Regions:
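A contiguous, basic/glycine-rich beta-loop/short-helix subdomain that forms a polymer-engagement track
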Residues: 1-23
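Conserved glycine-centered short motifs in functionally critical loops
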Residues: 17-140
Length: 140
């Protein structure tokens, strides 16, 4: 099943989206920061539509990665800048929907004045990276 490669992939900092965009996930002591980047993604439509599509795609993958890595506490998401309030609301709604099935209490607090998404997720167990580090220590 290639479990080792899947576990290694789940710890990588950069996650590629199907569209060619990326998520960069940086857990630190105080919070986790997730940065959404365009990378290779270039839409054929207007820039604003391209940004919206990439941010919407990122919402689903962010929810998947947060659950997979069991991230908790304060999570800040730096979406690609959106000009229109309608697009910002669509992305917040998509993020709410992506976390709706999460069994761990997750609250999307909204956007800051800098356009960062603030969210919190209750800690239910240690993050994946912590569990794997402890497992490595016991095998040494």
């Amino acid at each position: 099943y290639k479990i080792e490669s899947q576990l290694k992939k789940a710890q990588e900092r950069r996650v590629w989206l199907d569209s060619g965009g990326t998520l960069v996930i940086d857990p630190c002591e105080a919070m986790t920061v997730i940065d959404v980047n365009t990378a290779k993604f270039t839409g054929k439509r207007a820039l604003e539509d391209t940004v919206l599509r990439l941010n919407l795609e990122a919402c689903g993958e962010i929810a998947r990665q947060v659950r997979l890595r069991n991230l908790s506490g304060i999570i800040i998401i730096d979406m690609i800048d959106m000009k229109t309030p309608e697009h910002r609301q669509m992305v917040l709604d998509a993020l709410e929907e992506a976390f709706a099935s999460d069994r761990v209490k997750t609250v999307i607090h909204g956007l800051t004045s800098l356009g960062l998404v603030e969210m919190t997720r209750k800690r239910s167990r240690p993050p994946l990276r912590e569990m794997l580090a402890k497992q490595e220590e016991t095998h040494e």
